[in-house]
Design a protein with these regions (language model features):
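Glycine-rich beta-strand-centered segment in the early N-terminal region that forms part
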Residues: 2-16, 29-70, 98-101
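A secondary-structure boundary/capping signal
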Residues: 12-14, 26, 90, 135
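Histidine-centered active-site/metal-ligand motif
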Residues: 20, 42, 117
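Cytochrome P450 core scaffold surrounding the K-helix E-X-X-R motif
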Residues: 21-27
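Short beta-strand-to-turn element immediately C-terminal to the catalytic PLP-Schiff-base lysine
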Residues: 26, 49-52, 88-89, 176
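Residue-level marker of beta-strand positions
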Residues: 43, 62-63, 86, 130, ...
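NAD(P)H dinucleotide-binding glycine-rich loop of Rossmann-like/cofactor-binding domains
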Residues: 57, 67-134
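Mid-domain Rossmann-like dinucleotide-binding core that forms the NAD(H)/NADP(H) cofactor-binding site
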Residues: 104-176
Length: 176
């Protein structure tokens, strides 16, 4: 079990997603420079099990999710991530997980945030748009659902049958 600094908490991982970038990292070909040993895991939720003395906004038992990019560091890439039984994190990196959100869905906050950013901040998607979504993994499916909620027409390109079905269930207009 790792030791914590005064401004850190110890988190017990409760749910950790495996992103394609984690696979690239483990294969030694991720785009951000990194050095082994390194623990992957940037899509996660967990429980605070120990609190450093200068931490004021979190307490034992708090359910949390965390930031992926922290300044120059990338959680699970340039610094070790959440794919461990326990890991440390700075209070400023964490957000409380609402009681209505279970740990499994909490681990989806990061990929859903990527989809939200793409739709709302980069794409400014609205009902006049037609989107082509390349891939129906977690981020592609979140983009599909979000685009439909915004009224856009969606075309999802996905070779895997069960992911095609998931895209249809989330409202994709066309799936190829």
């Amino acid at each position: 079990v790792p030791e914590i600094s005064d401004d850190e908490v110890l988190v017990a991982a409760r749910s950790v997603g495996v992103c394609h970038s984690d696979i690239e990292l483990l294969e030694g070909r991720y785009i951000i420079p990194f050095q082994y040993p390194l623990i992957p895991g940037h899509e996660w939720s967990g429980e605070v099990v120990k609190v450093g003395p200068s931490v004021k906004g979190l307490k034992l038992g708090d359910r949390v999710v965390g930031e992926c990019v922290i300044g120059d560091d990338h959680f699970g890439f340039s610094i070790s991530g959440a794919a461990a039984e326990f890991f440390t994190a700075k209070e400023s990196w964490l957000h409380k997980l609402p009681d209505a959100v279970d740990y499994t869905n909490g681990a989806l906050v990061e990929p859903f945030s990527v989809a939200y950013y793409a739709l709302m901040r980069v794409g400014n998607v609205n009902a006049s748009d037609v989107l082509v979504v390349l891939g129906a993994g977690p981020i592609g499916l979140a983009v599909t659902a979000g685009a439909k909620a915004l009224g856009a027409v969606t075309l999802v390109v996905e070779p895997v049958a069960h992911r095609q079905e998931a895209a249809k269930k989330l409202g994709a207009d066309y799936v190829v």
